[in-house]
Amino acid sequence: MERLRRTVVQLEEAKRLILNGEVARLRLAVILLDNAVEVILHRRVNDTLRSANTYARMLQRFRDGQLDAKGEALRQEIAAKTIPQARQKKVARFFGEKLTLLSEDGELPAATARALRHLHDYRNELQHHDHVRQESIRPAALILFDIAVDLMVTLVPGSMSFGSDDNIDWLNDYGIEPIPFGRDDLREVIGTKLRHGLPLDVDGVRAALIAHLGARLDAMDANSAELAGYGLSPKDLAGMLQHHRRWEQGLPDAPSDAADIAPFDKLHSLVRWRSNAAGLTSIDDKLDLFDRFGTLEDELEPLERGLQEVVDAIEAAGEVASDIARGA
């Protein structure tokens, strides 16, 4: 019960931060929610690994050599339920491996796993790299909250105990009697109350994501048009970007690789990306919606960043030239 309480407190705090709406608080909400999800996954995975190790011990009881058909079938059935130690170490360490294992076991829908991979990348960006995507952080926080509550309800650890020192008065806030022993709907009731008051409808999330992508594509079109006005080819742009990035890193200049024009080899994709963004209007499932949004965002971001860097570098060079001309 204490573990459930810790998860609920995180979700309550994340909800409060989301309702506030300030970007700085939405950032904290995403960090809290990502941690809550990872802890929920960790608890469920631990149960899975304990079960797998039990089967591994059972497997050791079989004698070596060929068994009769029935015995061999049983041995193969038990062996299929074990997990190699090397994989267990990866599952214990990596978020993505936890998602893969629970998806393979049928405990985590594929759409949920895909969305969580994108959202975990969001958390890594804003926590470790201080990169906050301001226009999409609110929809991301809402979807992550929705998933976290769903996992709290569905990924129940193998057992839940009540200790004599447990404080269960907090259940009163959810309309649950002080002694909820035997209730099968405890988590569902808590989840319903947690979701109340948040705009978790798919229409609102969809509109925000499409508007966000539209604004970014507009900026990319404007930057592309500006650079085209200078008569610069994708090869020219790639060379300028490579030169600029080496200069920023304090590295000596080097000849550009003429064959490598990334990310400007994707300039022709702008029309397709805009069409794909418009296509999100037909998606009614939030998880599928965010999965497609995240995939599209990951695809366009290298070109978006490259265009902006070259535009900024040209503008900075122009300002330096103006200062020199004025004798500044």
Walk through the language-model features, giving the residues of each.
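Active-site-adjacent bridging/hinge elements
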Residues: 3-15, 117-124
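A long, hydrophobic alpha-helical segment
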Residues: 9-27
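Short, flexible helix-adjacent loops and helix caps
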Residues: 19-23, 45, 49, 128-131
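Charge-enriched, short contiguous segments at helix-coil
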Residues: 24, 99-162
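Short, hydrophobic, well-ordered secondary-structure elements
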Residues: 26-48
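Short, glycine/acidic-rich hinge or "gate" loops at secondary-structure transitions
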Residues: 29, 48-59, 165-170
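A broadly used, surface-exposed interaction patch
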Residues: 49-121, 128
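Polyanionic, low-complexity intrinsically disordered segments
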Residues: 131-328
